[in-house]
Protein backbone atom coordinates (compact mmCIF):
# COMPACT_ATOMS: atom_id res chain seq x y z
CA UNK A 1 0.00 0.00 0.00
CA UNK A 2 1.08 3.56 -0.78
CA UNK A 3 -0.41 6.72 0.72
CA UNK A 4 0.01 9.78 -1.49
CA UNK A 5 -0.47 13.24 0.03
CA UNK A 6 -1.12 15.88 -2.62
CA UNK A 7 -0.25 19.19 -1.04
CA UNK A 8 -2.25 22.36 -1.45
CA UNK A 9 0.53 23.97 -3.47
CA UNK A 10 0.11 21.22 -6.09
CA UNK A 11 -3.69 21.27 -5.95
CA UNK A 12 -3.83 25.02 -6.55
CA UNK A 13 -1.09 25.23 -9.20
CA UNK A 14 -1.51 22.11 -11.35
CA UNK A 15 -2.76 18.78 -10.05
CA UNK A 16 -3.21 17.33 -13.54
CA UNK A 17 0.18 15.59 -13.67
CA UNK A 18 -0.55 13.75 -10.42
CA UNK A 19 -3.97 12.69 -11.69
CA UNK A 20 -2.54 11.46 -15.00
CA UNK A 21 -0.01 9.32 -13.09
CA UNK A 22 -2.52 7.83 -10.64
CA UNK A 23 -4.23 5.09 -12.73
CA UNK A 24 -1.24 2.71 -12.47
CA UNK A 25 -1.40 2.98 -8.66
CA UNK A 26 -5.18 2.85 -8.26
CA UNK A 27 -5.21 -0.72 -6.94
CA UNK A 28 -2.77 -0.02 -4.10
CA UNK A 29 -2.96 3.68 -3.22
CA UNK A 30 -4.92 6.01 -0.96
CA UNK A 31 -4.94 9.73 -1.75
CA UNK A 32 -5.01 12.49 0.87
CA UNK A 33 -5.19 16.07 -0.42
CA UNK A 34 -4.78 19.58 0.90
CA UNK A 35 -5.95 22.89 -0.52
CA UNK A 36 -5.22 25.71 1.90
CA UNK A 37 -4.66 28.23 -0.88
CA UNK A 38 -8.25 27.80 -2.11
CA UNK A 39 -9.49 28.15 1.49
CA UNK A 40 -7.59 31.45 1.76
CA UNK A 41 -8.97 32.68 -1.57
CA UNK A 42 -12.57 31.88 -0.62
CA UNK A 43 -12.19 33.45 2.83
CA UNK A 44 -10.91 36.69 1.31
CA UNK A 45 -13.75 36.77 -1.22
CA UNK A 46 -16.14 36.57 1.73
CA UNK A 47 -14.31 39.37 3.54
CA UNK A 48 -12.76 37.06 6.14
CA UNK A 49 -9.04 37.40 6.79
CA UNK A 50 -7.29 34.01 7.15
CA UNK A 51 -5.69 33.60 10.57
CA UNK A 52 -2.67 31.49 11.45
CA UNK A 53 -1.16 30.54 14.79
CA UNK A 54 2.53 30.11 15.55
CA UNK A 55 3.38 27.40 18.06
CA UNK A 56 6.54 26.82 20.13
CA UNK A 57 9.18 25.32 17.86
CA UNK A 58 8.10 27.42 14.88
CA UNK A 59 5.25 25.27 13.57
CA UNK A 60 2.19 27.11 12.27
CA UNK A 61 -1.46 26.12 11.90
CA UNK A 62 -4.69 27.65 10.61
CA UNK A 63 -6.97 29.12 13.26
CA UNK A 64 -10.35 27.62 12.42
CA UNK A 65 -13.36 29.31 13.95
CA UNK A 66 -16.88 28.29 12.89
CA UNK A 67 -17.05 30.62 9.88
CA UNK A 68 -13.62 29.50 8.69
CA UNK A 69 -14.66 25.87 9.16
CA UNK A 70 -17.66 26.35 6.85
CA UNK A 71 -15.41 27.77 4.13
CA UNK A 72 -12.79 25.06 4.76
CA UNK A 73 -15.37 22.31 4.21
CA UNK A 74 -16.70 23.98 1.04
CA UNK A 75 -13.23 24.43 -0.46
CA UNK A 76 -12.05 20.92 0.37
CA UNK A 77 -15.24 19.39 -1.00
CA UNK A 78 -14.80 21.23 -4.30
CA UNK A 79 -11.18 20.04 -4.60
CA UNK A 80 -12.12 16.49 -3.65
CA UNK A 81 -14.86 16.15 -6.23
CA UNK A 82 -12.73 17.74 -8.96
CA UNK A 83 -10.02 15.12 -8.36
CA UNK A 84 -12.57 12.29 -8.32
CA UNK A 85 -14.24 13.52 -11.52
CA UNK A 86 -10.87 13.77 -13.28
CA UNK A 87 -10.00 10.22 -12.23
CA UNK A 88 -13.32 8.90 -13.52
CA UNK A 89 -12.54 10.54 -16.88
CA UNK A 90 -9.41 8.36 -16.97
CA UNK A 91 -11.42 5.23 -16.26
CA UNK A 92 -10.44 5.00 -12.58
CA UNK A 93 -13.15 4.11 -10.07
CA UNK A 94 -12.61 6.62 -7.28
CA UNK A 95 -14.57 7.51 -4.16
CA UNK A 96 -14.19 10.94 -2.60
CA UNK A 97 -14.54 11.12 1.17
CA UNK A 98 -14.15 13.39 4.15
CA UNK A 99 -13.21 11.77 7.42
CA UNK A 100 -16.82 12.22 8.50
CA UNK A 101 -18.11 9.90 5.75
CA UNK A 102 -18.51 6.39 7.14
CA UNK A 103 -16.69 7.73 10.21
CA UNK A 104 -13.36 6.92 8.56
CA UNK A 105 -11.44 9.58 10.52
CA UNK A 106 -12.37 10.37 14.11
CA UNK A 107 -10.65 13.19 15.93
CA UNK A 108 -10.66 14.87 19.32
CA UNK A 109 -11.20 18.60 19.29
CA UNK A 110 -8.29 20.65 20.60
CA UNK A 111 -10.04 22.77 23.23
CA UNK A 112 -6.92 24.85 23.98
CA UNK A 113 -3.62 25.30 22.14
CA UNK A 114 -0.30 26.86 23.13
CA UNK A 115 0.88 29.64 20.83
CA UNK A 116 3.63 32.22 20.58
CA UNK A 117 2.11 35.70 20.11
CA UNK A 118 3.50 38.61 18.10
CA UNK A 119 5.50 39.75 21.16
CA UNK A 120 7.15 36.36 21.49
CA UNK A 121 5.16 35.39 24.58
CA UNK A 122 3.63 31.94 25.00
CA UNK A 123 -0.13 31.97 25.58
CA UNK A 124 -2.93 29.43 25.73
CA UNK A 125 -5.82 30.24 23.37
CA UNK A 126 -9.05 28.62 22.23
CA UNK A 127 -8.35 25.77 19.80
CA UNK A 128 -11.30 26.44 17.50
CA UNK A 129 -12.51 23.62 15.25
CA UNK A 130 -9.19 21.84 14.90
CA UNK A 131 -8.76 18.19 15.77
CA UNK A 132 -6.17 15.56 16.62
CA UNK A 133 -6.78 12.24 14.86
CA UNK A 134 -7.60 9.42 17.29
CA UNK A 135 -8.93 6.69 14.99
CA UNK A 136 -8.73 5.64 11.34
CA UNK A 137 -11.17 3.04 9.98
CA UNK A 138 -8.50 1.37 7.85
CA UNK A 139 -10.74 -1.31 6.35
CA UNK A 140 -12.95 1.38 4.80
CA UNK A 141 -10.05 3.16 3.10
CA UNK A 142 -8.30 0.30 1.34
CA UNK A 143 -8.95 -0.02 -2.43
CA UNK A 144 -10.90 -0.83 -4.45
CA UNK A 145 -12.15 1.71 -5.24
CA UNK A 146 -9.40 4.31 -5.00
CA UNK A 147 -10.21 6.55 -2.01
CA UNK A 148 -9.60 10.31 -2.19
CA UNK A 149 -9.65 11.74 1.33
CA UNK A 150 -9.91 15.38 2.40
CA UNK A 151 -8.51 16.57 5.76
CA UNK A 152 -11.83 16.83 7.57
CA UNK A 153 -12.54 14.61 10.57
CA UNK A 154 -15.53 14.07 12.87
CA UNK A 155 -15.59 14.22 16.66
CA UNK A 156 -17.55 12.03 19.08
CA UNK A 157 -20.01 14.92 19.37
CA UNK A 158 -20.55 15.01 15.61
CA UNK A 159 -18.46 18.14 15.04
CA UNK A 160 -16.60 18.58 11.77
CA UNK A 161 -12.94 19.33 12.46
CA UNK A 162 -10.00 20.59 10.43
CA UNK A 163 -7.06 18.18 10.77
CA UNK A 164 -3.53 18.69 9.47
CA UNK A 165 -3.20 17.04 6.06
CA UNK A 166 0.36 15.77 6.50
CA UNK A 167 -0.48 14.32 9.90
CA UNK A 168 -3.62 12.71 8.46
CA UNK A 169 -1.60 11.14 5.66
CA UNK A 170 0.81 9.66 8.21
CA UNK A 171 -2.04 8.38 10.40
CA UNK A 172 -3.67 6.75 7.37
CA UNK A 173 -0.36 5.19 6.28
CA UNK A 174 0.20 3.74 9.73
CA UNK A 175 -3.39 2.46 10.04
CA UNK A 176 -3.43 0.63 6.69
CA UNK A 177 0.12 -0.72 7.03
CA UNK A 178 1.47 1.25 4.06
CA UNK A 179 5.07 0.66 3.03
CA UNK A 180 5.49 4.15 1.57
CA UNK A 181 4.15 7.65 2.17
CA UNK A 182 4.70 10.13 -0.67
CA UNK A 183 4.34 13.83 0.15
CA UNK A 184 3.97 15.84 -3.06
CA UNK A 185 4.51 19.60 -2.94
CA UNK A 186 5.86 22.34 -5.22
CA UNK A 187 9.53 21.77 -4.32
CA UNK A 188 11.94 19.00 -5.29
CA UNK A 189 12.43 17.83 -1.71
CA UNK A 190 14.20 19.14 1.37
CA UNK A 191 16.65 21.76 0.11
CA UNK A 192 19.69 22.65 2.22
CA UNK A 193 22.38 24.96 0.85
CA UNK A 194 20.66 25.09 -2.53
CA UNK A 195 20.69 21.31 -3.01
CA UNK A 196 18.14 18.56 -2.46
CA UNK A 197 19.02 16.27 0.44
CA UNK A 198 18.49 12.79 -1.09
CA UNK A 199 18.42 10.64 2.06
CA UNK A 200 17.77 11.12 5.77
CA UNK A 201 17.31 8.88 8.77
CA UNK A 202 14.43 9.56 11.16
CA UNK A 203 16.92 10.87 13.71
CA UNK A 204 18.51 13.24 11.18
CA UNK A 205 15.07 14.54 10.16
CA UNK A 206 14.21 15.31 13.80
CA UNK A 207 17.46 17.24 14.21
CA UNK A 208 16.82 19.28 11.06
CA UNK A 209 13.40 20.35 12.38
CA UNK A 210 15.32 22.38 14.99
CA UNK A 211 17.47 24.01 12.30
CA UNK A 212 17.00 27.57 11.06
CA UNK A 213 17.53 26.22 7.53
CA UNK A 214 14.15 24.49 7.64
CA UNK A 215 11.09 26.73 7.79
CA UNK A 216 7.34 26.84 7.31
CA UNK A 217 5.49 23.77 6.13
CA UNK A 218 8.71 21.80 5.66
CA UNK A 219 9.22 21.73 9.44
CA UNK A 220 5.91 19.94 9.89
CA UNK A 221 6.62 17.59 6.98
CA UNK A 222 9.98 16.57 8.46
CA UNK A 223 8.44 16.07 11.90
CA UNK A 224 5.75 13.79 10.49
CA UNK A 225 8.27 12.04 8.23
CA UNK A 226 10.51 11.23 11.18
CA UNK A 227 7.58 9.80 13.11
CA UNK A 228 6.49 7.73 10.11
CA UNK A 229 10.01 6.46 9.40
CA UNK A 230 10.32 5.26 13.00
CA UNK A 231 7.20 3.16 12.33
CA UNK A 232 8.92 1.50 9.36
CA UNK A 233 7.28 3.61 6.65
CA UNK A 234 9.52 5.06 3.94
CA UNK A 235 8.63 8.72 3.39
CA UNK A 236 9.37 10.59 0.16
CA UNK A 237 9.12 14.39 -0.10
CA UNK A 238 9.06 15.23 -3.80
CA UNK A 239 7.76 17.58 -6.50
CA UNK A 240 4.17 17.06 -7.61
CA UNK A 241 4.41 19.48 -10.54
CA UNK A 242 6.77 17.43 -12.73
CA UNK A 243 5.75 14.84 -15.32
CA UNK A 244 4.79 11.48 -13.76
CA UNK A 245 5.46 12.79 -10.24
CA UNK A 246 4.61 9.56 -8.41
CA UNK A 247 6.91 7.50 -10.63
CA UNK A 248 9.66 10.08 -10.18
CA UNK A 249 9.30 10.07 -6.38
CA UNK A 250 9.31 6.29 -6.08
CA UNK A 251 12.28 5.95 -8.44
CA UNK A 252 14.65 7.90 -6.23
CA UNK A 253 14.00 11.61 -6.72
CA UNK A 254 13.22 13.94 -3.84
CA UNK A 255 14.15 13.37 -0.21
CA UNK A 256 13.73 9.84 1.16
CA UNK A 257 13.40 9.45 4.94
CA UNK A 258 13.83 5.98 6.46
CA UNK A 259 14.37 4.54 9.92
CA UNK A 260 18.01 3.68 9.24
CA UNK A 261 20.18 4.06 6.14
Curated annotation (Swiss-Prot):
It catalyses: [amino-group carrier protein]-C-terminal-N-(1,4-dicarboxybutan-1-yl)-L-glutamine + ATP = [amino-group carrier protein]-C-terminal-N-(1-carboxy-5-phosphooxy-5-oxopentan-1-yl)-L-glutamine + ADP; [amino-group carrier protein]-C-terminal-gamma-(L-glutamyl)-L-glutamate + ATP = [amino-group carrier protein]-C-terminal-gamma-(5-phospho-L-glutamyl)-L-glutamate + ADP. NCBIfam families: argB (TIGR00761), PRK14058.1-4 (NF010662). GO terms for cellular component: cytoplasm. This is Putative [LysW]-aminoadipate/[LysW]-glutamate kinase. It comes from the Archaea. Pfam families: AA_kinase. PANTHER family: N-ACETYLGLUTAMATE SYNTHASE (PTHR23342), N-ACETYLGLUTAMATE SYNTHASE, MITOCHONDRIAL (PTHR23342:SF0). InterPro entries: AceGlu_kinase-like_sf, AcgluKinase_fam, Asp/Glu/Uridylate_kinase, Glu/AcGlu_kinase, LysZ. It is an enzyme of class 2 (transferase). GO terms for biological process: arginine biosynthetic process via ornithine; L-arginine biosynthetic process; lysine biosynthetic process via aminoadipic acid. One of its GO terms (molecular function) is N2-acetyl-L-aminoadipate kinase activity. The gene is lysZ. Involved in both the arginine and lysine biosynthetic pathways. Phosphorylates the LysW-bound precursors glutamate (for arginine biosynthesis), respectively alpha-aminoadipate (for lysine biosynthesis). Belongs to the acetylglutamate kinase family. LysZ subfamily. HAMAP family: LysZ. Substrate binds at residues 35-36, 62, 162. SUPFAM superfamilies: Carbamate kinase-like. Keywords: Amino-acid biosynthesis, Arginine biosynthesis, ATP-binding, Cytoplasm, Kinase, Lysine biosynthesis, Nucleotide-binding, Transferase. The record marks 5, 221 as: Transition state stabilizer. Pathway: Amino-acid biosynthesis; L-lysine biosynthesis via AAA pathway; L-lysine from L-alpha-aminoadipate (Thermus route): step 2/5; Amino-acid biosynthesis; L-arginine biosynthesis. It is found in: Cytoplasm. Its EC number is 2.7.2.17, 2.7.2.19. Its main location: cytoplasm.
Amino acid sequence: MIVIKVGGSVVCKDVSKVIQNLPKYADRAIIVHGGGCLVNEMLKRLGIEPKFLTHPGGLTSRYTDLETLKVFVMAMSWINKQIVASLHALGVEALGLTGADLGVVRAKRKEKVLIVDERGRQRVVDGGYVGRVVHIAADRLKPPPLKVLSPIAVSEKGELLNVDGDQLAFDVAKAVGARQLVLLSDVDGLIIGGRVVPHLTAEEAEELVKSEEVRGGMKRKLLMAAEAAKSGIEVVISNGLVENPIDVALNGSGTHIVKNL
